[in-house]
Amino acid sequence: MSDNEDNFDGDDFDDVEEDEGLDDLENAEEEGQENVEILPSGERPQANQKRITTPYMTKYERARVLGTRALQIAMCAPVMVELEGETDPLLIAMKELKARKIPIIIRRYLPDGSYEDWGVDELIITD
């Protein structure tokens, strides 16, 4: 039996009830009761002036910074430290992190929608 021989008249789905949840969604849109707040394009979350988060780099931030920087180095970005025969981008990124020369800013988002920007050179790195 091939696809050309099948008869799909659309009558096979007569016994299915319509979903009433869609009607509720349509009614909410008609009444103007949206739960979404739309901000103007110029209005963005503000950076906190006084920092409240810890000055320590987390292991997740460290992994993300090293991975991002290693990818940049692999794609021929300029290296910020003197090379002593290293060719592995990850090892070069680790050397840059130890020398605090990675040109990346970490943005930490807070629950109220604001954020804090920390330079890699400002954070305390534990090994």
Curated annotation (Swiss-Prot):
Key words, A-Z: Acetylation, DNA-directed RNA polymerase, Nucleus, Phosphoprotein, Transcription
Chain intervals with Acidic residues compositional bias: 1-34
KW Transcription (keyword) present: yes
Source organism, top-level taxon: Eukaryota
InterPro entries on file: DNA-dir_RNA_polK_14-18kDa_CS (IPR020708), Pol_omega/Rpo6/RPB6 (IPR006110), RPB6 (IPR028363), RPB6/omega-like_sf (IPR036161), Rpo6/Rpb6 (IPR006111)
Location of this chain's protein in the cell: Nucleus; Nucleus, Nucleolus
Family (UniProt): Belongs to the archaeal Rpo6/eukaryotic RPB6 RNA polymerase subunit family.
Record's protein name: DNA-directed RNA polymerases I, II, and III subunit RPABC2
The organism of origin for this protein: Homo sapiens (Human)
